[in-house]
UniProtKB/Swiss-Prot annotation:
<feature type="binding site">
    <location>
        <position position="211"/>
    </location>
    <ligand>
        <name>D-ribose 5-phosphate</name>
    </ligand>
</feature>
<dbReference type="InterPro" id="IPR013785">
    <property type="entry name" value="Aldolase_TIM"/>
</dbReference>
<comment type="pathway">
    <text>Cofactor biosynthesis; pyridoxal 5'-phosphate biosynthesis.</text>
</comment>
<dbReference type="GO" id="GO:0008615">
    <property type="term" value="P:pyridoxine biosynthetic process"/>
</dbReference>
<dbReference type="GO" id="GO:0036381">
    <property type="term" value="F:pyridoxal 5'-phosphate synthase (glutamine hydrolysing) activity"/>
</dbReference>
<dbReference type="GO" id="GO:0006520">
    <property type="term" value="P:amino acid metabolic process"/>
</dbReference>
<feature type="binding site">
    <location>
        <begin position="232"/>
        <end position="233"/>
    </location>
    <ligand>
        <name>D-ribose 5-phosphate</name>
    </ligand>
</feature>
<protein>
    <recommendedName>
        <fullName>Pyridoxal 5'-phosphate synthase subunit PdxS</fullName>
        <ecNumber>4.3.3.6</ecNumber>
    </recommendedName>
</protein>
<feature type="binding site">
    <location>
        <position position="162"/>
    </location>
    <ligand>
        <name>D-glyceraldehyde 3-phosphate</name>
    </ligand>
</feature>
<feature type="binding site">
    <location>
        <position position="21"/>
    </location>
    <ligand>
        <name>D-ribose 5-phosphate</name>
    </ligand>
</feature>
<feature type="active site" description="Schiff-base intermediate with D-ribose 5-phosphate">
    <location>
        <position position="78"/>
    </location>
</feature>
<dbReference type="InterPro" id="IPR033755">
    <property type="entry name" value="PdxS/SNZ_N"/>
</dbReference>
<feature type="binding site">
    <location>
        <position position="150"/>
    </location>
    <ligand>
        <name>D-ribose 5-phosphate</name>
    </ligand>
</feature>
<dbReference type="GO" id="GO:0042823">
    <property type="term" value="P:pyridoxal phosphate biosynthetic process"/>
</dbReference>
<dbReference type="InterPro" id="IPR011060">
    <property type="entry name" value="RibuloseP-bd_barrel"/>
</dbReference>
<dbReference type="Pfam" id="PF01680">
    <property type="entry name" value="SOR_SNZ"/>
</dbReference>
<keyword id="KW-0663">Pyridoxal phosphate</keyword>
């Protein structure tokens, strides 16, 4: 078992950057060239998982090793919710982070992975503060919004990040005598609720994911308080992946500078084809 503070420290190093989904070594090299702080190795981006249907599982270890061999930046990989054996395999490969991801088909509808039993740090998604604190209680070192991956639609990520921020502000301003009741209502560990009350933030970095397709989307999430951004289908489902990837990296760096945002948003070609969120929602997987 690894010290959670070491894991959180590794996650802190990704702040202010972009983590990009890649499905092969060539895309991984493009992501690194564009300035990504990490890549997420997977066989299909979320848009294709939605399109193809079926059961989405951990990627082939051969693919993950190929991607790890061509980049020097951290490599993440996804395991199904509750599938601790997939996580054991990924840890044995030497990935830098494991994402216990709702994008893949859940393996356990009741239990998430005991992340404290692993040396590798875990990323987990949330839709609200209670969900975030439950994952942190299990050992997650990094939290992200779930959004709605594969849609190119930012609305759910915005809703979720605003909800987390609203919940944090409520707890920060609550009377200490109310914290146990709040913990009960959130179904969250009491010690983590008291941490939020004292510090006004999560005890781990808080990133955004799910639906980021443009530089403006990325800057929006940063202005709303995200500390970094995951981009899945939005880059390599667009007309010019390298140019769009560089633009999104710049947007995360200069998220408060509208002039730079306007410049990097010019002439990017067609973005990914977006879809509405009126269908099965990946964000409802897990609890």
């Amino acid at each position: 078992m690894s010290d959670i503070n070491i894991k959180i420290g590794l996650a802190e190093m990704l702040k202010g950057g972009v983590i990009m989904d890649v499905v092969n070594a060539e895309q991984a090299e493009i992501a690194q060239q564009a300035g990504a702080v990490a890549v997420m190795a997977l066989e299909r981006v979320p848009a294709d998982i939605r399109k193809d249907g079926g059961i989405a599982r951990m990627s082939d270890p051969k693919l993950i090793k190929e991607i790890m061999s061509v980049v020097s930046i951290p490599v993440m990989a996804k395991a199904r919710i509750g599938h601790f054996v997939e996580a054991q395999i990924l840890e044995s490969l030497g990935v830098d982070f494991i994402d216990e991801s709702e994008v893949l088909t859940p393996a356990d509808e009741l239990n998430h992975i005991d992340k404290d039993s692993f040396k590798v740090p875990f990323v987990c998604g949330c839709t609200n503060l209670g969900e975030a604190l439950r994952r942190i209680g299990e050992g997650a070192a990094l939290i992200r919004t779930k959004g709605e991956a594969g849609t190119g639609n930012i609305v759910e990520a915005v809703r979720q990040l605003r909800q987390v921020n609203k919940d944090i502000n409520y707890i920060k301003n609550a009377d200490k005598s109310e914290l146990m009741a709040i913990a009960k209502n959130l179904q969250a560990p009491y010690d983590l609720v008291t941490y939020v009350h004292k510090n006004g933030k999560l005890p781990v970095p808080n990133f955004s994911a799910g639906g980021v397709a443009t530089p403006a989307d990325a800057a929006l999430m940063m202005q709303l308080g995200a500390e970094s951004v995951f981009v899945g289908s939005g880059i390599f489902k667009s007309a010019d992946p390298l140019k769009r990837a560089r633009a999104i990296v710049s947007a995360v760096t200069y998220y408060n500078d509208a002039k730079i945002l306007a410049e990097v948003s010019e002439d990017l070609g067609e973005p990914m084809t977006g879809i509405n969120c009126d269908f099965e929602k990946f964000s409802q997987r897990g609890w």
